[in-house]
């Protein structure tokens, strides 16, 4: 487990360094910290979040860490995503994502996830954008005490909207299992809704609802549960020129 965690970190760091483009001197670094409480069915606890990203005209790198410490369960999620726009068609971009997840509430003691695909800014506008993505993805997990790889076709829709008083985010992803190596149907839908309300310079109050649903799985009864979290967050810039 420790070795796999190290591989994940090295892969993310390598992608961040190798993914830099010629416009490095225009790159902007930001980081975000959040802490608060989380409520799920018949359980509650504390939540923590850290995010750091680097963006330039054509490239974007984003590393996120989520931690939920519940009374009876725990949730850990680490994700690194890198993307680069096509210079001739800047509304299109290619991306890759690598992630590690542990979710005892959903019966996921361990999952390594990877996906690669194509994204499109369907509707960019002044106050936000709507993005769609398609990708090929795979998991290596322990749902069935089995480490065989499970492959998926993945689609996603993402909407970000900002106003002077509040920012909102809506994400919906569907993973359709295409691998037949694992008998269990692990096709799933993941959704997240987020509201960010500014408090003072750099600080905000954040409300998030998330759900992961396995409608065709025999273990769905134990998994179709959402979480509601409330946190206070801070964001700032990092004066790096990497």
Residues of each region from the PLM?
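Outer-membrane beta-barrel transmembrane domain signature
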Residues: 131-204, 210-212
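Outer-membrane beta-barrel "beta-signal"
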Residues: 224-242
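Transmembrane beta-barrel strands of outer-membrane/channel proteins
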Residues: 35-39, 63-69, 80-82, 96-100, ...
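Outer-membrane beta-barrel domain signature
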Residues: 22-26, 36-43, 68-73, 103-109, ...
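Residues that define the transmembrane beta-barrel architecture of outer-membrane proteins
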Residues: 27-29, 44-48, 74-78, 110-114, ...
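Residues on the lipid-exposed face of transmembrane beta-strands in outer-membrane beta-barrel proteins
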Residues: 37, 48-56, 80-86, 116-120, ...
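Repeated loop/turn-to-beta-strand initiation elements of outer-membrane beta-barrel proteins
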Residues: 56-63, 87-94, 126-130, 162-170, ...
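Outer-membrane beta-barrel initiation region
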Residues: 20-71, 86, 204, 236-242
